[in-house]
């Protein structure tokens, strides 16, 4: 229990579609529906450290925190919430750091191993030996058409009498030798074979609740085997990411995403794009899974910060990033073209080491944090056409710092635009890198260690008359009609009382869900519609 007498939140996440929230606390687990908001399942059998959903089905993957023997952090339990029963249990050699699922595969991440299962039979298909991954970073595509796994792979230091300071970036490791090493590690750990192979291959729904198996390695694959992980410069690259095909059970490519260690990574819902952020948190990069090339690069802000989550919209139009400064930045991707790909590819990793200029909407400590609902400034609505409308400005976040920063950035952009006509595209892309399209700031003052997870929902239509305090000001019906008539592809519909928005949902480690909306055409500040407590009964 916390000091306030409330349960401690150990884990919180959205499901694959962003429509449900799974939460593990010191007392048990809870499952919530996002829209309409409400709790529809809870269990208080013991503290939970991981609670993952399979879309919106009744299947849950649960890992305990060790407060009682049945809730060991090394034991994975597959639950059926409709029947309130345990389908099966699997015990691993070390603590489970992450569990990911789609409709064909279940992946379990330990600190130095990844286990891949057929989710329909819980049969162990593959074991991957990886470099140490204490943060439990891993991403799995929900799509079966592009069934990929992405995980960081910093170099492993090798005790070599042939080459000093050897690691997996500067020495080649054959698949045979790496598998042999992996096998010897398992022998040292004393891992036993499956206690009942017939149960391991049985259908998931037919396994009895009391079934418990102890894993043994199936096929093994070292993080460096079969891949060209050697750096051309001979320097150690800590920001490597491996793509692994979960259908063919083969690694496909290693990409050098960043110079520093990876802090966050996420595959898009269709499995075609990968977003990454390093420990510094100032640069967000997006890669094509098919070509393994960098297609977008964004600057989040000036000062280093920890990126906690990355999330793509369903159509890959937007990318959201939540960070330790209680902000969420939304970047607009659009459709990648040759110019975007060229500009992203020419931006070197050295950009991340430079002093980045912030876009002014948000950075560490920027913006007011009051508990009142946000209101849209009248300045953000004009009578002009869709092409000239300014981004939405949240009046509750107007500060002197933001005004000064906005003025300086406008001057910087004008200078970059003027100089850009005299320089090649490579130099222009460095002078004027892409910034965030919209942002929001969680309305709390405390919580320096606040962690947030964000997701982008499907577009919705709002009746502005339902939110008079949100869309306040002297915006008349005539103004609305004028804007609507002049914007054939705008976010406003033909009916001036309605506006098309994109929901941005954020959950925090303090136990709240925040519902924001984003104007997909104008961007700017996201508007807070509602917030709900997750720990209250």
From Swiss-Prot:
Which residue stretches does the UniProt record annotate as biased composition, category Basic and acidic residues?
Answer: 387-397
- Keywords assigned: Autophagy, Endosome, Membrane, Protein transport, Repeat, Transport, Vacuole, WD repeat
Q: Where is the composition biased (Acidic residues)?
A: 348-369
Ranges of Low complexity compositional bias?
338-347
Record SMART domains: WD40
The molecular function terms in GO held by this entry are: phosphatidylinositol-3,5-bisphosphate binding; phosphatidylinositol-3-phosphate binding; phosphatidylinositol-4-phosphate binding; protein-macromolecule adaptor activity; ubiquitin binding
Protein name as it appears in the record: Autophagy-related protein 18
Organism the protein comes from: Eremothecium gossypii (strain ATCC 10895 / CBS 109.51 / FGSC 9923 / NRRL Y-1056) (Yeast)
């Amino acid at each position: 229990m916390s000091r306030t007498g409330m349960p401690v939140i150990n884990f919180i996440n959205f499901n694959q579609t962003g429509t449900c929230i799974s939460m593990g606390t010191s007392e048990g687990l809870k499952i919530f529906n996002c829209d309409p908001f409400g709790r529809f399942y809870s269990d208080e059998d013991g503290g939970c450290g991981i609670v993952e959903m399979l879309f919106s089905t009744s299947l849950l993957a649960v890992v305990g925190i060790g407060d009682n023997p049945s809730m060991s952090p090394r034991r994975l339990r597959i639950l059926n919430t409709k029947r309130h029963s345990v389908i099966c249990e699997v015990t691993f050699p070390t603590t489970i750091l992450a569990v990911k699922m789609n409709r064909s595969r279940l992946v379990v991440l330990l600190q130095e191993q990844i286990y891949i299962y057929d989710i329909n039979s819980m049969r162990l298909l593959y074991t991957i030996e990886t470099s140490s991954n204490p943060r439990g970073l891993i991403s799995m595509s929900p799509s079966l058409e592009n069934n990929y796994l992405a995980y960081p792979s910093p170099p492993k230091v090798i005790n070599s009498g042939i080459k000093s300071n050897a690691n997996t970036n500067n020495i080649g490791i054959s698949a045979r030798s790496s598998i042999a090493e992996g096998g010897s590690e398992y022998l040292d750990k004393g891992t036993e074979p499956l206690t009942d192979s017939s149960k391991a291959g049985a259908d998931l729904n037919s396994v009895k609740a009391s079934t418990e198996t102890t894993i043994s390695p199936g096929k093994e694959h070292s993080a460096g085997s079969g891949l060209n992980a050697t750096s051309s410069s001979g320097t150690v690259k800590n920001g490597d990411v491996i793509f692994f095909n979960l259908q063919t059970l083969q690694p496909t490519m290693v990409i050098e995403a960043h110079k520093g260690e990876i802090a966050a990574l996420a595959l898009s819902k269709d499995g075609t794009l990968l977003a990454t952020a390093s420990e510094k948190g100032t640069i967000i990069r997006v890669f094509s899974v098919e070509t393994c090339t960098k297609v977008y690069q964004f600057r989040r802000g000036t000062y280093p910060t920890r990126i906690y989550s990355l999330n793509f919209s369903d159509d890959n139009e937007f990318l959201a990033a939540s960070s330790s400064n209680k902000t969420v930045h939304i970047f607009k991707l659009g459709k990648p073209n040759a110019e975007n790909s060229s500009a992203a590819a020419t931006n070197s990793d050295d950009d991340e080491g430079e002093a980045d200029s912030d876009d002014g909407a948000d950075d560490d400590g920027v913006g007011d944090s009051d508990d009142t609902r946000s209101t849209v400034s009248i300045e953000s609505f004009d009578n002009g056409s869709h092409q000239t409308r300014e981004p939405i400005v949240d009046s509750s976040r107007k500060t002197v710092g933001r005004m000064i920063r906005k003025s300086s950035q406008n001057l910087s952009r004008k200078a970059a635009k003027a100089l850009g006509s005299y320089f090649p595209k490579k130099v222009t892309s460095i002078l004027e890198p892409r910034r965030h399209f919209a942002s929001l700031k969680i309305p709390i003052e405390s919580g320096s260690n606040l962690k947030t997870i964000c997701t982008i929902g499907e577009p919705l239509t709002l009746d502005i008359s339902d939110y008079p305090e949100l869309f306040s000001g002297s915006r008349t019906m005539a103004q609305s009609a004028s804007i609507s008539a002049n914007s054939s592809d705008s976010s406003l519909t033909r009916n001036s009382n309605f506006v098309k928005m994109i929901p941005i949902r954020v959950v925090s480690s303090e136990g709240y869900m925040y519902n924001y909306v984003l104007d997909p055409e104008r961007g700017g500040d996201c508007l807070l519609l509602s917030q709900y407590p997750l720990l209250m009964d």
